[in-house]
Amino acid sequence: MKTHILRHGQTEYSTKYLVNGDPSVPVQLSEEGVRSCQRAWTVLPLHSLRTWVASGFPRAQQTALLLTGVPAADLVIEDRLNELDYGEFEGGPFLGYGDWLDRRGAWRRPPGAAESQREGIRRMLLGVQACLALPGPRLLVSHGLLLSVLFWQQNRPAGEAMPLFFPEAPCLQPLDVQDAVLGGWIADLLSDLDAEASQDPDDRGDAAI
């Protein structure tokens, strides 16, 4: 069985590289984002999907509904696929958060945030893992960080440690993965996170407190 995972369609926030990790902020798709969803019919086997899953964010759910072409009463909402909580950086440029992350490390929670970058990645991976129990083939509509991590894992050189920053994942570019392969990726990534978390805080850039 196969899982198709993609980042939501383009938004005004994404074109300006602004961060939104608060699902109560109504960030919707831009006009181009809506058009891109219509074009996605040519690259996704939408007719064969049995389960549709979206994060708890409006832009992810809007993307899923546009891809179905009809109101999807059976759309599954999986909050563990949500975007990272950026805390006080909410609504600001990614560069501001990125500079803070570079200085403070992947395990430190930004002021006002409920999770660190690594804690957020773990949450997202557990969300994907849970979705593998749903009837397949399935489509998961999530956010950039999760897709960036999975694309990195797909092309990961042997022995390479998880980086602090990942290449940006394009909107609506699907990652199509056999369930057995995806399950192996998740297990490897969770193991990496466990190994990082067990290190001395000084060696991993400050533990979340």
Language model: regions and residue ranges:
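Active-site-proximal alpha-helix that buttresses catalytic centers in soluble enzyme cores
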Residues: 2-70, 100
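Glycine-rich phosphate-binding loop signature in dinucleotide/nucleotide-binding domains
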Residues: 45-48, 131-136
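Acidic, low-complexity terminal tails and accessory targeting/binding regions
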Residues: 77, 83-95, 151-209
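A short, acidic, amphipathic alpha-helical segment used as a generic capping/interface helix at domain edges
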Residues: 120-134
